[in-house]
Amino acid sequence: MDDLVREELPNGTRRLFARDAQGGEAGFAVIEPGRPGQPAMVEVQVRPEHRSCGLGGRLVRAALDEAGPGAYLWDHENSPASQAIVRRNGLVPVRTLCQMRRWLAYPPLPEPVFPDGVSVRQYQGPQDDEELLRVNNAAFDWHPEQGGWSIEKLRERLAQPWVDPAGIFLARDEQDRLIGFHWTRTHPQTQTEHKLGEVYVLGVDPACHCKGLGKALTLVGLRHLRDQGLAQAKLYVEQTNAPALATYRGLGFTVHAQDVAYVRG
C-alpha cells in the first residue's frame, strides 16, 4: 500500500487516502475543522476488499494526528472491526448520537396543536435567512456542528440540490417574529435503504416559552413527509438530551442505531 496522500478540500476540510497496487483508492479519512472552540471531526472508510490488513487503524492514527488534540473520531458501524481499532488505539467514547425512526402511516400522526398566537408558514426565500440564522444559532449555541453558523454557511446549505423550500416550516409569534423552525429532508432510495424522510433540523428559540412548540413543529414536518408519499422518517438526537428523547418517543420514534464519537484517552 502506498503512503497516504493528502488532499485539501474547500472550507478547510482535508482528506487522506491510500491507494492499492493498481492505483485504486483503498480507503480514506476526512478531517473537518471545528468552529472556534470546537473539535475537528474525523471519519474513516476502508473498502471491504482492503479490510483486515491494518489500513483502518493506520488511517485513524494518521487522521487523528493531523486533526489535532481533542479531535472526534466518528464510528457509524459499531462493528467488531471498528471496536478493535478503538481498543488498540486507546480511544474513549465522548458523544453518542441516537438515530431514531418512525413509520409515518402508523401509529397515525395527530394534528399539530400550536400555542395561542403562533402561526406557521413555509420558507419563502432569502428574506427569511437572517431570522432563520438567529434562531438556529440561539437554539444550537452548544452544538459542535449546527451552532455558530454564518449567513454564508446557511445559504450554502440552503443551496444544496436536495433542499426543498416547501419542506422548511417557520413558526412565528403574534409580532411576526420567528420563534422556531423545522427543516425536513428527503433521502433518495439506495441499494440498502428505501426512500426516507428526515427531521433534518428542528430548532426553537430558547427565549420562547411556548409549551409544545417543538412537538407541534415536529408533527407539521412529519405530516408533510407522509403526504409526499414517504413511508418512514428518521432523526438524530444526542443521547444526553433527555427532554428531546422523551418528546420523540412520545411521538412514536424508537432508536434504530447509534453513532459514537471517540477521542484519544
Curated annotation (Swiss-Prot):
Leading EC class: transferase
EC number(s) per entry: 2.3.1.189
Keywords per UniProt: Acyltransferase, Repeat, Transferase
Residue span(s) of domain N-acetyltransferase: 1-110, 118-265
Reaction it catalyzes: 1D-myo-inositol 2-(L-cysteinylamino)-2-deoxy-alpha-D-glucopyranoside + acetyl-CoA = mycothiol + CoA + H(+)
Annotated acetyl-CoA 2 binding sites: L202, G203, V204, H209, C210, K211, G212, L213, G214, K215
Top-level division of the source organism's lineage: Bacteria
GO biological process terms held by the UniProt record: mycothiol biosynthetic process
RNA-binding as UniProt keyword: no
Subunit structure: Monomer.
Biological function: Catalyzes the transfer of acetyl from acetyl-CoA to desacetylmycothiol (Cys-GlcN-Ins) to form mycothiol.
Entry's family note: Belongs to the acetyltransferase family. MshD subfamily.
NCBIfam families recorded: mycothiol_MshD
Descriptive protein name: Mycothiol acetyltransferase
Lineage of producing organism: Bacteria, Bacillati, Actinomycetota, Actinomycetes, Mycobacteriales
